[in-house]
Design a protein with these regions (language model features):
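Alpha/beta-hydrolase active-site loop
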Residues: 124-143
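Short beta-strand/loop motif that positions the catalytic acidic residue
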Residues: 363-365
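A catalytic-pocket lid/entrance helix-loop region that shapes and gates access to the active site
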Residues: 171-232
């Protein structure tokens, strides 16, 4: 009889990676997650200070999703601008991770979803604080993943990638911001001009014709609009007539942002039901509701990230509002922040860094995306050897490496692989 060979094992053995994550400074919880793309995937919850300059002011719990390709593989630091919900999907794999067979360290942005402090003190929602969060995660996880690191993000996440580079230059080996704006004010002003030039004259005319038709039929469509908002339980900070106007104005930006096709725009001869269904499908009034999971973004936009305005002049005859000035503050900001001033310090700092320095950055934009109007393409000049710009012809806010024309795509991949050598 071999008695010594009998062992009692735990139901699930903790892997070396899980054990190392659990030993990280300020790690609160490490939870295995299901993945069809990685052998190991975990939710890591860290405790981080609200104010990195004064940790005694309190802390919050910060969610990070770690997807493991190998200790010897490069690591992609995803500088998410919003919540991490989609990163929890079993099939999630970020584009660069797929291309480079790399680990993913996905950082949910502070004040979004599971990384929202309680109480929600808006004072600590700043770009610099979010950059410090990323720097801290980079330092902690760098002990586990000692290879090359690349930071990347999409849209607001792309902006976050660039501001991370601004505050912590050299923290990683390269940066890949996708479709990220660098806005200079609450209503930047460049987007309206962009929308007057984007696409063809026929496409722009089709967009404006639809906006006009929606406004002309206001009396017939408003009962449907009211019923829809009531059924959904939407609450707004402005009268419903103004929300209707804003939806009509938003349509042009949304149309180009998401790469819609002009042949899908209904003719002016369609029924009220057909017109309304397309309208709601294109611009759901949920975007303008009082409180959403993206409220924190609008606080940031109003404080220092900036946003876009609307050109009301072509539609003035049909609008119920005189203009849309200051709509960001009136429609989106919580009541306690209605007097919040915009601070251009962040814009100036990012502009100065991107203009003067030449870090390893690959910027990716879509030519037809309105956010490209306030992007950082201007920072890439012939004298710079490391900063590179790629603009997809006809591309939208959905532009990715995979959507680029093949020669452009190959050049992007070669540049990024060069950082890993």
């Amino acid at each position: 009889m071999v008695l010594a060979a009998v062992f009692v094992l735990p139901a699930v053995a903790r892997t070396p990676l899980q054990q190392r994550l659990e030993k990280l400074e300020r790690a609160i919880e490490v939870t295995p997650l299901e993945s069809t793309r990685f052998d190991e995937k975990y939710e890591l919850v860290l405790r981080q200070p609200l104010d990195w300059q004064a940790p005694e002011k309190g802390s919050f719990t910060h969610r990070i999703v770690v997807s493991h390709a190998g200790f010897d593989r490069p690591t992609i630091l995803v500088t998410e601008g919003y919540g991490a919900k989609y990163a929890y999907r079993p099939d999630y794999r970020e584009e660069l991770s797929q291309l480079l067979d790399a680990n993913i360290v996905f950082v949910e942005h502070r004040y979004f979803l599971g990384s929202t402090p309680d109480p929600r003190d808006w004072h600590y929602l700043t770009a610099e604080a979010s950059a410090c969060d990323l720097h801290d995660v980079r330092q902690l996880l760098g002990a586990i993943y000692p290879g090359k690191w690349i930071a990347t993000g999409i849209s607001k996440g792309g902006t976050t990638t660039m501001l991370y580079a601004t505050f912590f230059p050299g923290d990683v080996d390269g940066y890949v911001p996708y479709v990220g704006p660098v806005n200079r004010s609450r209503e930047d002003g460049r987007h309206e001009k962009f929308l007057r030039r984007v696409g063809t004259a026929d496409e722009r005319a089709a967009v404006e014709r639809f906006q006009t038709e929606v406004l002309r039929r206001r009396d017939r469509l408003m009962p449907r609009f009211e019923a829809y908002c009531r059924e959904k339980g939407y609450e707004f900070r402005a009268p419903l007539t103004e929300i209707y106007d804003l939806c009509a104005l938003e349509y042009a930006f949304s149309f180009w942002q998401w790469g819609s096709n002009s042949y899908e725009i209904p003719a002016t001869s369609v029924t009220d039901d057909e017109l309304f269904d397309y309208f709601i499908g294109a611009v759901d009034p949920e975007y303008f509701v009082r409180e959403t999971p993206t409220t924190s973004f609008f606080v940031q936009a109003a404080r220092e990230l900036g946003y876009y305005g609307y050109d009301t002049r072509p539609l003035r005859k049909y609008l119920s509002i005189r203009n849309s000035k200051d709509y960001l503050r009136r429609i989106f900001l919580p009541d306690e922040l209605r007097d919040l001033d915009f601070d251009r310090t962040l814009y100036r700092r990012m502009h100065r860094y991107l203009k003067r320095e030449d870090p390893n950055i690959v910027m990716i934009y879509g030519a037809n995306d309105p956010w490209t109007a306030s992007g950082a393409a201007w920072a890439v000049t012939p004298r710079k050897r490391n900063m590179k710009l790629f603009v997809q012809p006809g591309g939208s806010h959905r532009t990715r490496i995979a959507t680029l024309p093949e020669p452009m795509r190959e050049e992007v991949i070669a540049a990024i692989r060069g950082w890993l050598e």
